[in-house]
């Protein structure tokens, strides 16, 4: 294929996509492991619980990377941050089990205070090199009106970690520890307003809700009375976009388009 022959962007763009190993319409094809980055202990279940359940049921290994301890997620002034963090980690383990997830890496940074630093980026890179996933999922840092800095930082740190995980001179201590560089096919953004891929979760919606509700510290009865319809409405929104009853939306971006790409939004 000689790209000099193309005279317009659409032809060249289509040809470029065909050269990639990653296919947008079959993002999990031939993927054996997925790493799902979450800022707080309930985010993977809330954002992608249905997708995760379907992936694990199909034999794909899903691993969580939890960035903060969740110690701020309460309105109860009688509960200490330390006590809440311990409780939330146990809730996360039970929730993950419902969805078929067997491993959780917890970095234990402070809730609401996830640092946007090289050190956090290095820790994420180390986990990527340990787990060697085919795809990494993370919150979309460009979601309009997202008010939580942990979510924005998690997305940006995840993108940067994916970009650097394949570079041997980045965090060379990993090499000394026997962790080889690892390049990622693509990233997928959940909590996104611009999905380009949908998963029909109509048949596992109740399982997803059960996994979310397992985070009992976050969803007591009075809170769940609002959050259950909220989560159903989000799933119906993605379902409306994709022709399903309930769906989850993900925006996939091939790794090469994460740098100097003016048309990544076109994908």
Swiss-Prot record:
pH note: Optimum pH is 8.5.
Alphabetical list of Gene3D superfamilies matching this protein: LmbE-like
Pathway listed: Glycan degradation; chitin degradation
InterPro entries assigned: GlcNAc_PI_deacetylase-related, LmbE-like_dom_sf
Principal EC category: hydrolase
GO MF terms held by the record: diacetylchitobiose deacetylase activity; hydrolase activity, acting on carbon-nitrogen (but not peptide) bonds, in linear amides
Compartment list: Cytoplasm
UniProt KW Cytoplasm keyword: yes
Known EC number: 3.5.1.136
GO biological process, one term: chitin catabolic process
Record has Hydrolase as a keyword: yes
CC annotations in GO: cytoplasm
Temperature and activity: Optimum temperature is 75 degrees Celsius. Activity levels at 37 and 100 degrees Celsius are 20% of that observed at the optimal temperature.
Stimuli inducing this protein: By diacetylchitobiose (GlcNAc2).
Free-text function comment from the UniProt entry: Deacylates the non-reducing end of diacetylchitobiose (GlcNAc2). Can also use N-acetylglucosamine (GlcNAc) and N-acetylchitotriose (GlcNAc3). Probably involved in chitin degradation.
Family: Belongs to the PIGL family.
Subunit note: Homohexamer.
UniProt-recorded name of the protein: Diacetylchitobiose deacetylase
Source organism per UniProt: Thermococcus kodakarensis (strain ATCC BAA-918 / JCM 12380 / KOD1) (Pyrococcus kodakaraensis (strain KOD1))
């Amino acid at each position: 294929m000689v790209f000099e022959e193309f005279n317009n962007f659409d032809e060249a763009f289509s040809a470029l996509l065909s050269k990639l190993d990653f296919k947008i319409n079959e993002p999990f094809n031939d993927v054996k492991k997925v790493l799902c980055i979450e800022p707080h202990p309930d985010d993977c279940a809330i954002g992608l619980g249905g997708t995760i359940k379907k992936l694990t049921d199909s034999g794909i290994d899903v691993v969580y990377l939890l960035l903060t301890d969740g110690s701020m997620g309460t309105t109860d002034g009688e509960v200490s941050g330390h006590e809440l963090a311990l409780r939330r980690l146990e809730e996360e383990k039970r929730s993950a089990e419902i969805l078929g997830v067997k491993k959780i890496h917890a970095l234990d940074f402070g809730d609401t205070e996830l640092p946007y630093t090289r050190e956090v980026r290095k820790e994420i890179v180390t986990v990527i090199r340990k787990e060697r996933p085919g795809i990494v999922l993370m919150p979309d840092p460009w979601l309009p009106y997202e008010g939580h800095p942990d979510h924005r930082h998690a997305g940006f740190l995840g993108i940067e970690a994916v970009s650097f995980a394949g570079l041997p001179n980045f965090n060379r201590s990993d090499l000394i520890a026997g962790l080889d560089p690892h390049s990622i096919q693509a990233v997928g953004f959940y909590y996104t307003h611009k999905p380009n891929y949908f998963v029909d979760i109509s048949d596992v919606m109740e399982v997803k809700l059960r996994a979310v509700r397992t985070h009992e510290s976050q969803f007591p009865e009075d809170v769940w009375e609002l959050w259950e319809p909220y989560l159903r409405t989000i799933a119906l929104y993605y379902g409306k976009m994709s022709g399903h009853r309930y769906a989850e939306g993900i925006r996939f971006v091939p790794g090469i388009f994460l740098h100097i790409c003016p048309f990544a939004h076109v994908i």
